[in-house]
Amino acid sequence: FLTTMIYQVMKDYDFPYKVYIDTPLGIDIFNEYRKILSGDELKLFDEVLNWDNLIFVRDAESSKALVHSNEPCVILSTSGMCNNGRIRHHLKKAVPNPNATVLFVGFSTPGSLAALLKDKNVKSISIDNKQYTCRCASFSLKSLSGHAPFCQLLDYYSSINTNRIVLHHGSEKAKLTLKEKLTSELEKKCKSTRVIIANSSLKISL
C-alpha cells in the first residue's frame, strides 16, 4: 500500500530517486497480493510493479551493497519494532546521518528500537552493541497501521460467543483499557465472557 502511495504521488513529478523494496517476505507478499486483485486495483498494482524507479532487493548481498551505497533513495524495509531483519543495517547508516529520514508506519512496542527512535528525547541508540547518535529526522504515519482500531476490536470481540478472551499483544496500559471497555460491552450484551490479560506465568488449558 505504501509503495502504491509513493508511486501515485511521484509518478507525474519526474521523481529521480530509486525506491528499493528490501524485504524478502515483503517481496513474497507482493507476488501473492497480485493473485487476489482484479479490475482497476490490479491495473494500478501492475503499473506500480512496472515502475522504472521500483527495485526489489531479493538476496543478502544486494542488501549489503545497498547499505554501503551513497545513492540518495527510498528504502522500504519491514520490522515494525526494528528489532530484527535487514532494517537494522540500514538504521546503522541512517540514524547518525542528518540528511536521512526514518519514516515509521504504525505501532511500535514501548522499549523497542523503533519506539526509541520515535522518542525525540532519546539522543543515542544501541544497535548490535554499538552506540549511534540520533541525527536523522524521524516521523510516524499512524494512519497507515495494519492493526484494527480500538472501536473495531470492541465490536468484533463483544460479538463472538466464547468463554474467555485473552489479551496478549500490546502495552499493559492499552490491554488494561481494552479489558475494561470490552468487559463493559460484553455485560451490555448479557454475556459472561471473561477478559484476561496474559502474562508470562499464565497457563491456558485448551
Task: Map each language-model feature to its residues.
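Acidic/His-rich, metal-assisted hydrolase cores and their charged scaffolds
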Residues: 1-206
